Amino acid sequence: AAAAAVGSRSKAVIPVDLFGQMAPIEAVRAEIPTLPLIEDAAQSIGASRMIDGKKVMAGEGATIGTFSFFPSKNLGGYGDGGMMVTQDEAIALRLKRLRVHGGAKQYFHDEVGYNSRLDALQAAVLVAKLPHLSHWSAGRRANAAYYDSAFADIPEIVTPYIDPANESIFNQYTIRVERRDALQAFLKEKGIGSAIYYPLPLHLQPCFQYLGYREGQCPVAEAAAKSVLSIPVFPELTSAQLDEVVGTVRAFYGR
């Protein structure tokens, strides 16, 4: 439980939306009502969740919502970029200061900030792409549904679980599979792309070893890192391409 990890130095809680599906932010808020929530919505722009009978969009229900416009995201720019949203006016004003060296007035700095402005080129690309986001998300959901059906009879594959309260935008279509590395090699041999998100859990990353974490402390994350594989789900996939992916995966498992 998240509450067990909260200590005297805790400043905020960061629920992470993974693979296009929102985290249960209302449950986190109920469990830890005294701390602000910063929703990591980098992979979920356009996703939604029903909370108390209301449709809440990704980034909307937290104290701050953060989005990524990295080119690989569902709404990607031409290069790096991102956005933070909030309904708190004081936080919004501070974020605006921080993005431009910590000052509201040029050459006057109220605090130490950053050079984090979205450049005009990225903004132009995103403005052109934004009207298509809903259509692209629908295409991803349709492709995901096709995969769900096509893999339903293969016990070696676990398709993505989608919380009934959520509408995912499938930033990735990530399956858990047996013989993951062999399957990925087989797909590559057939000219089909795939990716592992993510091969090493955070607690085992070299940069965090000073904290004393060791293998076996987060068994679910470790098992996932050894079994997950993301296959193509982008909305431009043709029926023939979908069939090729499905047929190749099924052939690997002798189906």
What is each model feature region?
Residues 1-77, 83-85, 230:
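Active-site phosphate-binding strand-loop segment of PLP-dependent enzymes
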